[in-house]
Amino acid sequence: MKLPEIESFDLSQKRVLVRADLDVDLKENYRLKAILPTINYLIERGANILLLGHKGRPQGKDSLLSLRGVCGELANLLNKNINFIEEFPTMPPEGDLVMLENLRFNPQEESNGQEFAQALANLGEFYVNEDFAVSHRVHASIVGLPKLLPHAAGFRFRQEVENLAKVLTNPRKPVVVIIGGVKEDKITYIASFEKFADKILIGGRLPEFIQNNLNQKEIIATLLPDKEDITIHSIENFEEEIAKAGTIILTGPVGKFEEEGHRMGTKRVFEAIAKNQEAFKVAGGGDTVKAINLLNIAQSFDWISVGGGASLEFLAKGTLPGIEALN
């Protein structure tokens, strides 16, 4: 899948709007680090950068969901000053590195309001999408804005698409998908995954929401009585399938790994993935990444996506609204 590249444009002295992944926990700043190559590239090319992003799901303005703290952390990572703009500007703000306050403080961001998209476009001359994690949303800064300005995908955005696309295009067989976590809506993706997966291993709280096997490809874990982890028998079944896999997609822990007493399932399943050195291994989702880091096995994965829902949506549909907007 070919996306427009920032290297193809002369952006010197241009006002570049960067839709950045700023919805981060400051204790887990790996997602901020992921956008640094794009920002540094634009700085080196002499662009004037206006960073756009969101945090949480505010209902109007909410000081607890301000991006000011994120601005400070990103400034430290870049070792540069970032001018933080609290009120939405009517004119392009001065400075070569600027961040606007949480876009979701304006309800038109999430409703994809044309007026808001135009107001954003008036602040710049070029648009870069460097927020893969929210590109499954039809929001003004994701799909409205690139219709109004010349545009390209950021480096991380392109890497996300390239690596996730490998799973859909001639993957090494067999393909094993592990779905865990607590979000019931993940079940809706199973039918789509059946199109390319050979086995789908279902853990976490999801077995509670499945009445019976939908397909022979699925192995549904049995939960312990407290429902906080999967049984030893289920762990062994998962380990057996993982050992045979040529491609592994991991989305969600299989138990409440944050508590040591409920960590065995996640530990053994994740370590089984790490031990399979022949497979192409992809992981995604906030809790998945936390568990990977806790177990210190990040180096065993070929790709760790910054997208949770966006990764699932891409694997299910092969595209996202944010990708379509760039094309």
Regions found by a protein language model. Give the residues of each.
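Active-site loop-to-helix "anion-binding N-cap" substructures in soluble metabolic enzymes
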Residues: 1-327
